[in-house]
Amino acid sequence: MELRAYTVLDALQPQLVAFLQTVSTGFMPMEQQASVLVEIAPGIAVNQLTDAALKATRCQPGLQIVERAYGLIEMHDDDQGQVRAAGDAMLAHLGAREADRLAPRVVSSQIITGIDGHQSQLINRMRHGDMIQAGQTLYILEVHPAGYAALAANEAEKAAPIKLLEVVTFGAFGRLWLGGGEAEIAEAARAAEGALAGLSGRDNRG
C-alpha cells in the first residue's frame, strides 16, 4: 500500500463543512471540528484504514471513497487529539510515517476576473457549494495528490471572505473552485497555495 496524501485540518471552516455535509456519504462533520484526510493506493485498501481508525478512536468517518486507482478516507471529531490518533492508527496499519506522504504539487492555478454570465451558469450547474455571479472573479486550483484540495479549501476560507463553489478530493487530481471579489480571491489563492507549499513529503515533481 502507498501513502499518497495525509493532512490534518485543525478547524473545519463553515463553508467547507457545509460542502462536506452536502457530499458526505457517512457521518457529517460540524464546524470547527478537526479532520484528517488520508489518500492511499490501491483504493480498495481504504476499508482497512477505516477499520483501524474506528477501533482505535471515537472519530467518525465522513467520507470513504474507493475509485479506480486511489482511495480516500476523512475522519473527524471535536478533539484534535482523537483525530491525530486516528491518523496514527491508519499510518501504523500502512507501516508508514507522515513523512512518507507525497508532497503537494500544484498542477495548475487560474484566476479569471469579470466572469461572463454564460460561464457562471456552467459553473453553477456543476457545483455542490455556493454560486458565482456574473462579474465576479473565479479561482481554479488543481493539485496532486487529490486529497490536498481539502487543505487548500480550508485555508483559503480562513484567509478571505470568498465563496466555496466546489472541491474534488479524489481522483487523479484534486480541484478547488472559488468565487468572489478580485482582491479577496487573490488573498485566498495565496493562502491556499501557501498551505500546500508548506507541507513536506516525498518528492512529487511529476
From Swiss-Prot:
Major place of residence: other
Ranges of residues in domain BMC circularly permuted: 2-104, 105-206
Motif stretch (Pore gating residues): 67-68
Disulfide bonds: none
Cellular-component GO terms for this entry: bacterial microcompartment
Disruption phenotype: Not required for efficient BMC formation; when deleted from an artificial operon (Hoch_5815, Hoch_5812, Hoch_3341, Hoch_5816, Hoch_4425, Hoch_4426, Hoch_5814) being expressed in E.coli, a 2-fold decrease in BMC formation is seen.
Domain notes: These proteins have 2 BMC domains which evolve independently of each other, giving the term pseudohexamer to the trimerized subunit. Although the homotrimer fills the approximate space of a BMC hexamer protein, the BMC-T trimers are more compact. Their universal presence in BMCs indicates their structural importance. The homohexamers form pores of at least 5 Angstroms in diameter; in the stacked homohexamer both pores are closed. In the BMC the inner pore is fully or partially closed while the outer pore is closed.
PROSITE patterns linked: BMC_CP
Record function comment: A minor component of the bacterial microcompartment (BMC) shell. Expression of 5 proteins in E.coli (BMC-H (Hoch_5815), BMC-P (Hoch_5814), and 3 BMC-T (Hoch_5812, Hoch_5816, Hoch_3341)) forms 40 nm artificial BMCs with a molecular mass of 6.5 MDa. One of 2 stacked pseudohexamers in the BMC. There are 20 BMC-T pseudohexamers per BMC, composed of mixed BMC-T1, BMC-T2 and BMC-T3. The shell facets are 20-30 Angstroms thick, with 1 of the stacked BMC-T trimers protruding to the exterior.
Keyword Ribosomal protein in annotation: no
Keywords tagged on the record: Bacterial microcompartment
Subunit-level organization: Homotrimerizes to form a pseudohexamer. These stack, with the concave faces together, with the concave faces together, in purified bacterial microcompartments (BMC).
Record localization: Bacterial microcompartment
Superkingdom, natural source: Bacteria
InterPro entries xrefs: BMC_CP, BMC_dom, CcmK-like_sf
Biotechnological applications: Artificial BMCs can be made in E.coli by expressing (Hoch_5815, Hoch_5812, Hoch_3341, Hoch_5816, Hoch_4425, Hoch_4426, Hoch_5814) or (BMC-H (Hoch_5815), BMC-P (Hoch_5814), and 3 BMC-T (Hoch_5812, Hoch_5816, Hoch_3341)). Cargo proteins can be targeted to this BMC.
Record carries keyword Cytoplasm: no
Family statement: Belongs to the EutL/PduB family.
Descriptive protein name: Bacterial microcompartment protein trimer-3
